[in-house]
Amino acid sequence: MSKIVKVIGREIIDSRGNPTVEAEVHLEGGFVGLAAAPSGASTGSREALELRDGDKSRFMGKGVLKAVDAVNGPIAQAVIGQDAKDQANIDKIMIDLDGTENKSQFGANAILAVSLANAKAAAAAKGMPLYEHIAELNGTPGKFSMPLPMMNIINGGEHADNNVDIQEFMIQPIGAKTLKEAVRIGSEVFHNLAKVLKAKGMSTAVGDEGGYAPNLESNAAALAAIKEAVEQAGYVLGKDVTLAMDCAASEFYNPETGNYELKGEGKTFTSQEFTHYLEDLTRKYPIVSIEDGLNESDWEGFAYQTKVLGEKIQLVGDDLFVTNTKILKEGIEKGIANSILIKFNQIGSLTETLAAIKMAKDAGYTAVISHRSGETEDATIADLAVGTAAGQIKTGSMSRSDRVAKYNQLIRIEEALGNRAPFYGLKEVKGQA
């Protein structure tokens, strides 16, 4: 009943109005899985390749018909007749057939869409929710938890058309006892932040991930505005709500000088100086997690940053590790960071994603499940976070249905699982247990 009988690929539109790949996997017995690949804006140089057509006459070169053709052609031919329940085998067939290190033949967007659609079809054939099937694939059947959200309520960097250099300023509703309560707290802070910004005469237009994107005089000003919003909402910063940042520092690193240039503030830092700039912010505000605090190739700088901050807060590698076990293994051996951001499309298959989560956890690193800035209504990351008991999720702010779809799926899952999926809150964050 779980044999693949048909695979369909199509070009659909993501949350930025760009094309992406959607795949359907059909099984015997009429079971169907549907999934879409997300797309990033600030991308690590060692990510698996997102295949675009380059035909300027369609979607300004961003079409994905080549990737769709790969799904409908060689990928479909290779997986039809295979057992969808054997996820590792399905992924291996596609990866081997592609034959490249970075999935550049078919595109990680093609392989991932089929990989996730296959998992959904297999879950349907087994008569279980996707998160339960993922837990079984993960070797942790029946072990679930609800993730602490990192809610990106001020967007900067590559995610917004403003002067703020740091890409994401996030809140974590640690005072919540449940995921649903965390969503409520996040929503209340989000709406109060709009009032704070309006009172200052600032824009409340939103960026790619649903957070506000005002022009601010400094990164500290963003943190101060959030502090004011938290207090206006009736919460205590540091007790009910903590802060997190994604610097995406590769985006403001100057490779010619080796310096970090905060153009919004008119400041330039060496690698060590920027670490101390961040350290100063953590002294002034309850920041418990910093992602990509340096350029992805500045491993010497990351070793120093981990030495300075790694005992106090969570240091997450995104562009640094790109959900790649080879790179993560090297980072673990060198004591670089203490957490990994998990993005399906950085590596391009569910099996490899699960391997990265396992490697991180086995090494005492945390794993933060994440969306991309270009998303669809696909909410698979919600099931991934619960099914691997990862403990933390980044899926944007409290606006835009491409972000809210994930929160709503988490609410449904929590309702279904009840006390089988505890919400541990701040205990999940490295250095905060």
From Swiss-Prot:
Active site positions: 209, 343
Record's subcellular location: Cytoplasm; Secreted; Cell surface
Catalytic activity field: (2R)-2-phosphoglycerate = phosphoenolpyruvate + H2O
Cofactor note: Binds a second Mg(2+) ion via substrate during catalysis.
Entry annotated with the keyword Transmembrane: no
Presence of the UniProt keyword Secreted in the record: yes
Entry superkingdom: Bacteria
Pathway: Carbohydrate degradation; glycolysis; pyruvate from D-glyceraldehyde 3-phosphate: step 4/5
Binding, (2R)-2-phosphoglycerate: 167, 343, 372-373, 394
Gene Ontology biological-process annotations: glycolytic process
Needed cofactors: Mg(2+)
Family annotation (Pfam families): Enolase_C, Enolase_N
Swiss-Prot/TrEMBL keywords: Cytoplasm, Glycolysis, Lyase, Magnesium, Metal-binding, Secreted
InterPro entries: Enolase (IPR000941), Enolase-like_C_sf (IPR036849), Enolase-like_N (IPR029017), Enolase_C (IPR020810), Enolase_CS (IPR020809), Enolase_N (IPR020811)
Top enzyme category: lyase
Assembly and oligomerization: Component of the RNA degradosome, a multiprotein complex involved in RNA processing and mRNA degradation.
Family: Belongs to the enolase family.
Protein name, UniProt field: Enolase
